[in-house]
């Protein structure tokens, strides 16, 4: 009798356990499986993909991070400004820009302390909007933590040994200049005290349009420490800047992409700041979040229409 009761109890426990496993499996699949459908986007029609030009560091990092292989974009633009203007004026467009470029569009008097508030205001007033990627909003905090999927570094590169004024400027960038970097993107390290040796000379800098706004602030900040230095800035793109440094046509290059192996052999480089690639849509587009896979598939031409994503 006791053996029969024991078998009965064990059978009941086994059945209950099996039911619980089934329930967990059902709800687990619902919460961890495919993402929620997008809002109704049928009125948006065809997707207009906007890309940067070949040679752009932002494009290189975008393609690399997302494994974009096609990049037969509907429209190609040659600057961050053109990208934002195109997306802002086109309801069905999707594009990508440096997160720091959004900050640069704001009041020129922005400080590191009020950047978050002004970015929040920008999201309400601009004709374009940054959206979440994989459910994570791009911000200084998510860039520092690495939680945002499309983070990247900003570089200064140079050939050979730096002269006195170039060394002084680079020391400024990596110390007190980090406060200026923080006003636009995210500093590589905490700002520190800087004492210039007030070397005389001229420095020519060329390269990335994403890094250029940061460099403008660094040049202005350095002038208060060393008025004897003259620094010229030419905005092109990362590849052009790096090639110019290799040829000796400029003293320093700005790059918003990682250096290629052959470039690393020919140039020395420093990471001066952290940034991210923000995905931008026209402000009236109802979409607020896309996965990295969805973005990749859009640029790999898997989805001709916005409604195809669903």
Identify the meaning behind each predicted range.
Residues 5-17:
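Bacterial N-terminal signal peptides that target proteins for export
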Residues 16-24:
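Sec-dependent N-terminal signal peptides
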Residues 27-31:
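C-terminal motif of bacterial Sec signal peptides marking the signal peptidase cleavage site
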Residues 32-310:
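Exported/periplasmic ABC-transporter solute-binding proteins
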């Amino acid at each position: 009798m006791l053996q029969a009761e024991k078998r009965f109890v064990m059978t009941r426990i086994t059945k209950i356990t099996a039911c619980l496993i089934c329930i967990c499996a059902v709800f687990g699949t619902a919460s961890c499986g495919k993402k929620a459908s997008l809002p109704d986007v049928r009125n948006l029609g065809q997707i207009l993909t906007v890309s940067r030009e070949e040679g752009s560091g932002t494009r290189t990092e975008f393609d690399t991070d997302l494994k974009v292989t096609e990049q037969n974009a509907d429209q190609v633009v040659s600057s961050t400004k053109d990208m934002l203007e195109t997306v802002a004026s086109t309801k069905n467009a999707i594009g990508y820009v440096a997160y720091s470029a959004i900050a640069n569009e704001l009041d020129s008097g922005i400080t590191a302390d009020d950047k978050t508030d002004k970015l929040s205001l920008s999201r309400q007033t601009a004709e374009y909007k940054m959206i979440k990627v994989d459910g994570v909003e791009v911000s200084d905090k998510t860039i520092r933590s690495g939680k945002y999927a499309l983070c990247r570094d900003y570089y200064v590169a140079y050939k050979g040994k730096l002269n006195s004024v170039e060394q002084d400027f680079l020391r400024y960038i990596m110390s007190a200049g980090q406060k200026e970097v923080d006003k636009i993107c995210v500093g590589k390290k905490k700002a520190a005290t800087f004492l210039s040796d007030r070397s005389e000379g001229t420095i020519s800098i060329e390269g990335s349009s994403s890094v250029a706004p940061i460099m403008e602030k660094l040049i202005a900040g350095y002038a208060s420490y060393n008025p004897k230095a003259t620094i010229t800035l030419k905005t092109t793109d990362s590849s052009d800047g790096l090639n110019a440094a290799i040829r000796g046509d400029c003293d320093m290059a700005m790059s918003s992409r990682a250096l290629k192996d052959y470039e690393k052999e020919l140039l020395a480089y420093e990471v001066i700041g952290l940034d991210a690639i923000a995905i931008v849509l026209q402000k009236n587009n109802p979409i607020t979040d896309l996965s990295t896979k969805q973005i990749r598939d859009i640029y790999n031409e898997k989805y001709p229409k916005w409604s195809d994503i669903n």
